[in-house]
Amino acid sequence: MKFVLDYKITTILLIGLILRIISIYFYRDIEIVNEWGIIVKNLEENNILSVHSVQGVPVPNIFMPPLYPLFLYSIKIFFSNTDIFLWIIYFTQLLFALISIYLAYKIFLEFFSENISFIGSLFFATFPLNVYAVSQISSIVLQMFLFNLFILSFLKLFRNMDHKFLFLFSISSGLLMLIRGEYFIFVLFSLIYLYFKNKQITKVLTISVLVLLIISPYLIRNFNIFNVITITKSSGYNLLKGNHPNTKVEGTPMFLSVGKIVPEVNEKLQKLNENGPNVKYDLMQDKILLDQAIEFIKENPTKYILLYFKKFFSFMFLDINSSYPNYYSPFHIIPKLFLSITTLIGLILSFRFKLNIINYVALFYIANIGLFSFFFILPRYSLSLLLIQVILSLFL
């Protein structure tokens, strides 16, 4: 993969750089809060990857995927001063964001002419939520970088199973699974798609082994602690957050306050806490939340089926009842609606009943929305599919 910069992509990168510097200056987080802050603090003070504490004692984490907390902690090791620590994070995320723009441009060139790729890259680079993301302590910027690397590698492998891209695809796949556990499903889908296109089982198995090698240290860690083979176990929390009597499309914020938001689980959670610190606490808590979410859905299936389609609609277009600050700002809602409409039209125009690359993109898009809609839809989730949406939109 040759990194050659012409004046077009240089212009886009310069615009992207300026916009993101402005975003960081005005909108940056001034501290690490919520789960990120807790995990980094526990790594620093207690040498344990932990997001929950029982009676003041941190318990091992299986709730959060590990890559972004470890990314934060790796910086914290060298920069203990809070201000410097945060600025290094923003600078690093800015670098990831600029590389993501370049990768997006290379991806668009796999489908379109230079002029159309320039337009797509400019839209990708200036999409307001994408610009804003770099100023936040969130895994989304790192995720987008890895995802763009994943897609570019997949495109190259789809056309020619080159060893160089085989390794890039394997690395990006493994790291994506460590930043968002559900990528296991999409990596598996991609491998199956590759096999049916190229019929090269040896190379597909090689990728599988390499991915397994990347994630195996964390799988072994979780097996030793929890006796389960998984990267994360938070399906109960996520399902309940998006499927309880008082929830909405974007879910109900309930980190460290589940019992207050869903009183039906309060008694069981209290008993779990009264038993004292337990290395399997995260696993046991998630089982309680999963059982309760399933019970809610069984009690009123019609309500939650309708809610599922509301979530699907809100992901594809907009959430008509969002409580997120500035969600309805013209700078957010107009580009989002424009992209949503063009994506849908592009999806309809480009889809064919063939085993081709554009169908992979279309199926990847639909499958992601379908999966997320079982849980809840946050505004930033749309960023994870921004590249896919722009590809589909450019087929107009």
Where in the sequence are the language-model features?
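Transmembrane-helix motifs of polytopic, lipid-linked glycan transferases
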Residues: 10, 91-112, 149, 153, ...
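Short helix- or helix-capping micro-motifs
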Residues: 16-19, 117-128, 152, 173-177
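Extracytosolic helix-loop segments that constitute the early lumenal/periplasmic catalytic or substrate-binding loops
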Residues: 21, 32-60, 67-70, 77, ...
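Loop-to-helix entry region of an early transmembrane alpha helix in multi-pass inner-membrane enzymes
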Residues: 66, 70, 78-99, 121, ...
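Transmembrane-helix signature of polytopic, membrane-embedded enzymes
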Residues: 101-126, 144-145, 164, 356-359
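Membrane-interface transmembrane helices that cradle and orient dolichyl/undecaprenyl
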Residues: 111-114, 150-168, 176, 194-198
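Short acidic/glycine- and proline-prone juxtamembrane loop motifs at membrane-interface regions
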Residues: 129-142
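Membrane-proximal stem/loop segments at transmembrane-domain junctions that anchor or position
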Residues: 226-310
